[in-house]
Structures are given as structure tokens and as C-alpha cells.
Design a protein with these regions (language model features):
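Active-site rim/adjacent substrate-binding subdomains
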Residues: 1-96, 108, 115-117
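Short alpha-helical catalytic segment bearing the HExxH-like zincin motif
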Residues: 96-104
Length: 121
């Protein structure tokens, strides 16, 4: 899938989210990259054999003070080639993009991995 098509898939997935979630994402940059960089993998302690589809970088809403303004916009990175490498069809890519985006957006809202696993994400 070319980058333009993949980015459109990401945008459409975000549009399908409930409005109350979308409005809170206004200061969150959603960035598509091919793969996580080696520097990012090292910083996160991710072994080379592990696959990373997405990453939330920022301060979760639950950890922010009332008067605290973010220094930089939060970011959600979506790794296109990593997702495509693991999927066998465009339908699987679409489903994995949805799962990954919801997972990373949940981190923005303050949910941790254990909770997300418990609810199926």
C-alpha cells in the first residue's frame, strides 16, 4: 500500500471514533513512519525480534495538572511497514490500524497496557 493510501486509512479510522474522543485529539500529532528507528527501539528497550506497530509519546491526560500546558504536542506514531509485514490482506491492515490507533489513543487517555489487554486491545 502506498503512503498516501495508508495515511487516508489512518484518517478514516480517526473519523470513525466517537466525537468526544476526536475532539480531545486536536493537539496530538499522528505520524506515519515505515518502522520504528533503531534509536527509538533502544530507548524503549524493544528487542530486534519484537514488532512495534505504534507508539504514544507524551503526557497522558490523567497525569496532567489543571493549569499545565504541554511543552510539545503529544505524538502517536503508526509504523506502516511493520503493520503491513504482519498482515496478509488490505482488510487485515485496516483492522490492525484500527486496533493500533485505539490502543495508542487509550494511552493518551491514561490507560495502561494491562488494562488494554484485559479489554481486548
Amino acid at each position: 500500500m502506498d503512503r498516501k493510501t495508508f495515511e487516508a486509512l489512518v484518517r478514516n479510522t480517526i473519523r470513525e471514533l466517537p466525537r468526544e474522543f476526536r475532539t480531545k485529539l486536536k493537539n496530538v500529532a499522528i505520524i506515519v513512519e515505515d518502522y520504528p528507528s533503531q534509536e527509538l527501539r533502544q530507548r524503549m528497550g524493544i528487542p530486534p525480534e519484537d514488532t512495534l506497530f505504534g507508539l504514544y509519546e507524551g503526557v497522558p491526560l490523567t497525569d496532567r495538572g489543571f493549569f499545565e500546558a504541554p511543552v510539545q504536542p503529544d505524538r502517536i506514531l503508526i509504523f506502516q511497514k511493520a503493520i503491513e509485514d504482519e498482515c496478509d490482506s488490505p482488510e487485515e491492515v485496516k483492522e490492525e490500524v484500527k486496533i493500533t490507533l485505539v490502543h495508542e489513543i487509550a494511552h493518551f487517555f491514561g490507560m495502561d497496557d494491562d488494562y488494554l489487554i484485559d479489554i481486548g486491545y
